[in-house]
């Protein structure tokens, strides 16, 4: 018999750094999910990723207090800021540029994000990443 679904939730947790402190602990605890079990499983799954990279995670939890999680790749903005060597995007992206990235770097980011993007091919994924760069004030050369 299938488990009864209780709900889903989304968290953004740094890779390899899940711990019971806020915001992870309270978010899981109020839904009755075993916090330490989640932290151990999350840290084990993200140990091969870059430490501290923000990982969007979709947690599906069931009435018997069990859960499954799907860990996605870090946001395109994270990769773009890293490639452009900037701390944050522009406050007025249409008038101000904060950094530049090359087309090769955009392709590399698109290839890394391909499984999470709604694109059929690498060119479509590159257009999505280019849009993110434009909205952050990062110029592509």
Curated annotation (Swiss-Prot):
Q: Which UniProt keywords apply?
A: Methylation, Ribonucleoprotein, Ribosomal protein, RNA-binding, rRNA-binding
Changes after translation: One or more lysine residues are methylated.
UniProt KW ATP-binding keyword: no
Can you cite a GO biological process for this protein?
Answer: translation
Q: Name one GO cellular component term.
A: cytosolic large ribosomal subunit
Q: Does the keyword Repeat apply?
A: no
**Which spans of this chain does the record mark as coiled coil?**
none
Highest taxon above the source species: Bacteria
Where would one find the signal peptide in this protein?
none
Query: Gene3D superfamilies per the record?
Result: Ribosomal protein L11, C-terminal domain, Ribosomal protein L11/L12, N-terminal domain
Q: Which GO terms describe its molecular function?
A: large ribosomal subunit rRNA binding; structural constituent of ribosome
Q: How does it assemble?
A: Part of the ribosomal stalk of the 50S ribosomal subunit. Interacts with L10 and the large rRNA to form the base of the stalk. L10 forms an elongated spine to which L12 dimers bind in a sequential fashion forming a multimeric L10(L12)X complex.
The UniProt family comment states: Belongs to the universal ribosomal protein uL11 family.
Q: What's the stated role of this polypeptide?
A: Forms part of the ribosomal stalk which helps the ribosome interact with GTP-bound translation factors.
The protein's name is Large ribosomal subunit protein uL11
Q: What is the lineage of its organism?
A: Bacteria, Pseudomonadati, Pseudomonadota, Alphaproteobacteria, Rhodobacterales
